[in-house]
Amino acid sequence: MKKFITLVLMLLAACVLVGCNNGSTGSKTGDIAETNYTVETVENLNAQAPGSVVVSFRIPFGTKIENQIRDFADEFQALYPSVTIELEVVSGYDEMKSATIQDIGGGKVPTMTVGYPDHFAEYLISKSIISLDKFIKDPNVGYTTEELADFLPGYITENRQFDKNGTYVGLPFNKSTEALYYNVEFFEEFNLEVPTTWDEMETVCAQIMTIVAGLEDDQYSWLGKIKTNLANGEFIPCLYDSGGNFFTTIIHQFGGEYTKSIYKSNGLVDVQRGTLCFNTSNEAYEAFEYLQGLSKKGYISMPDALELTYGSYAYNVGKAIMNIGSTGGSGYYADAICTTGVAPLPYKTEEHKNVIQQGTNVCIMSQASDLEKLAAWLFIKYMLQPEKTAEFAMTTGYMPVRQSAYELQDYIDWLAGPTNEAKVHNGTAKYASEGWQYFVDAAWAGSSTVRNECETAMIQIIVNQTDINQALQDAVGRIG
């Protein structure tokens, strides 16, 4: 178990921020985020009337994560009686970003929120996020050098990508990656090896199609109505949940380029525009050509091919033997008719073993009062304690964001348990032991549109068998 923990930390320390300067050095060139605030004192916060300092926390999460945050809020409010934590739950990440942008333009902005780097880029246009550097460096409420170093380096890098000074615009909150979920009984019954490369995936999928062609409905309880599904064109050996992740991951795995950040002369990232690379990258074309070939053979596709939102729906009833999806979504496999195994997703070559780092970060909005900012900061610190980020991981399946959290006995004991979440954490340990690198792509306002249009292009290429160049150029045209 200690070996697993060491491997995870090694991997996260090697996170690659693609197309961006990692921003840890350089002379002062301007402020990317709002710095015009004063770090209030805890004494003044505690002197306020009970519940009078209201911190609104906007989140897009489902019930499981929401309930865990509510538990944290209850604990925090017991420590700071003058503070009230109000959760504002918005249904969906995009809806949350849209609501926040609208509020920045004239509504009631939350005190704090979570978001992806491209969300933060949009908020930074108007400096609606504060720089956390004042809080981090404050001798009374900040982090020591040792505490700050306890955060996983890759997660910190993502939050410091917007200028050459490495300004903190947020801290990591809920983090995940992707994994290959597979039908254990099928692989064991027919003596198949779980694929580690895309070439092996092609071979295994061919074997699967040969095997299932001779099977009857309900011949195996862990395969379901296989003959009917085949006859209806509703069986695919492997599905990939996220078209956006599929698009960018395969480009990186083939050594291509997706996007790049643009640095202005003052050392700040241009948060309103970036450079598209996927449409001119020969390696990107090669990647899509290869995957389209697998799709034409009926080996791999996306949930859209079955008119589904997630591949886990098909996997759970035997319409797929493998599904590539988020490690944060392991709970969706709980109702599968088979035993679910977890492994790293396939890669192209040893030189490009890339896997995406995903999940949100947490920030404080500049419109809040100084007392509200302090209360929000203290709440963030509370939730990101090693014990709390480990508790969050064990409850939700997301990864701890502090290195010392991986060494806590409660977390170590949990890893040895039978839950799907623990299985995922153990199953993806090879990401650290076998030379994988997490990547995070460049972010700017509108880069989420790039991702969305590239997901559409991926559906066209994989599901609809559209001409690759046409699909890519159409995506560029839609992006504008």
Protein language model features and the residues they cover:
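C-terminal capping/gating helix-and-loop segments adjacent to ligand/active sites or protein-protein/ligand interfaces
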Residues: 58, 419-479
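Hinge/lid segment of periplasmic solute-binding proteins
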Residues: 30-47, 97, 118-177, 217-230, ...
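Extracytoplasmic "Venus flytrap"/periplasmic binding protein-like
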Residues: 75-154, 185-196, 314, 322, ...
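Extracytoplasmic/periplasmic substrate-recognition and gating elements
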Residues: 78, 84-86, 189-190, 297-300, ...
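Glycine-centered hinge/linker elements that transmit conformational signals in sensory
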Residues: 205, 261-304
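Short, well-ordered beta-strand elements
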Residues: 51-62, 83-88, 112
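A structural signal for short loop-to-beta-strand junctions that line the ligand-binding cleft
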Residues: 20, 102-103, 110-111, 141-186, ...
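Extracytoplasmic/periplasmic solute-binding protein
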Residues: 158-173, 178, 202-273
